[in-house]
From Swiss-Prot:
It is found in: Virion. One of its GO terms (cellular component) is virion component. This is Uncharacterized protein L567. Residues 1-26 form a coiled coil. Transmembrane segments: none annotated. InterPro entries: CotB-like. Keywords: Coiled coil, Virion. The lineage of its organism: Viruses, Varidnaviria, Bamfordvirae, Nucleocytoviricota, Megaviricetes.
Length: 320
């Protein structure tokens, strides 16, 4: 059983126990392996609403553990990539603030997720105490404020280092998504599905610029995902990526061909699953030094975790 199976199993047990306790008081009585079908079936069968009674606390812990880690890594990457002193130092300070928070509330309690781990295990969830949402929001707002300032500076044309505007904008949007997941309002299934597609497209757009110019085939593949024009490469040269895509499917992903929600979610899930596998295999090439790029192995795993988590979120939405 993998991490998210355990997470969902424990969450279900907690909800059942909570309901039993509620009923007894009223009546006077008594956290992956990609492509694993068993995993997918169990995940779908246990899908629950985020604010279902008793479940919100555990979802908050998992959201903060995941996205807090992503924010911490974003800020370290920005610190390393910036040259302008104030922005560079501010990125490091924000990084350290997240690191201290995660150390105090997660790492020091034995909750140290692996490089590809996108969800906490049942044992890890049990170790975490109550989280102060005000503290979490303070860190998120601080991060959004910093990234917003950086985006504005970069869009003005000022050179401050080796971070380009689209990368910083992508990081800002993830921070804003994190804030909404913690505080609401809840995304509708359509809103969140469209956000996932946008996220994946912009993620691949940023990744494309980090590949060595000699990696022509990989650049073409990554750019096809970024521009959502995979059909131009589908089936060519017997490459595993991209898979078979039609221009109609791409139009749906780009929002140019309005369809019912079920169709949108089906095509979006296909896109997300394929990118998750692509990110996994690309990360393995980076780890084994088979790909020329300036992508640090930590960033490769960072990207995989996001694709994997969003894929599972789409599967959950589809099961509701």
């Amino acid at each position: 059983m993998n991490h998210y199976d355990q997470y969902q199993k424990y969450k279900k047990k907690y909800l059942d126990l909570k309901n039993q306790l509620n009923n007894s008081s009223q009546y006077g009585g008594n956290c992956g392996n990609y492509g694993n079908n068993q995993f997918n079936n169990q995940f779908n069968s246990q899908a629950t609403n985020r604010y279902q009674t008793g479940g919100a606390e555990f979802d908050l812990k998992d959201e903060v553990a995941f996205w807090g880690r992503q924010m911490m890594e974003h800020l370290l990457l920005l610190h390393l990539g910036l040259d302008e002193e104030e922005l560079k130092n501010s990125a490091l300070q924000n990084h350290m603030d997240w690191k201290r928070y995660l150390t105090e509330n997660f790492f020091s309690k034995g909750v140290n997720p692996g490089p590809d781990q996108a969800f906490l295990t049942t044992n890890e969830l049990e170790k975490i105490g109550l989280l102060n949402k005000n503290v979490v929001n303070g860190l998120i707002d601080q991060t959004i404020q910093y990234k917003s300032k950086l985006v504005k500076t970069l869009n003005s044309g000022q050179w401050v280092g080796w971070i380009y505007p689209a990368m910083a904008q992508h990081m800002l949007e993830e921070a804003e998504y994190f804030k909404r997941k913690v505080n609401g309002p809840d995304y509708t299934p359509e809103q969140e599905t469209k956000f996932v597609v946008h996220h994946h497209s912009t993620e691949m757009g940023a990744t494309t610029q980090l590949l060595d110019p000699t990696e022509k085939d990989n650049i073409k593949i990554a750019k096809s995902y970024a521009d959502i024009c995979m059909s131009k490469l589908s089936g060519r040269n017997k490459k595993p990526f991209p898979n078979q895509w039609t221009s109609q499917e791409e139009a749906i992903l780009r929002g140019q061909d309005p369809v019912d929600l079920a169709t949108l979610m089906r095509i979006s899930l296909k896109y997300s699953r394929e990118l998750t596998q692509f990110a996994k295999e690309t990360g393995q090439k980076i780890d084994s030094k088979q790909l020329k790029s300036i992508i640090h192995p930590v960033l490769a795993h960072h990207i995989f975790r996001e694709f994997y988590r969003f894929t599972k979120r789409l599967e959950q939405l589809g099961a509701q």
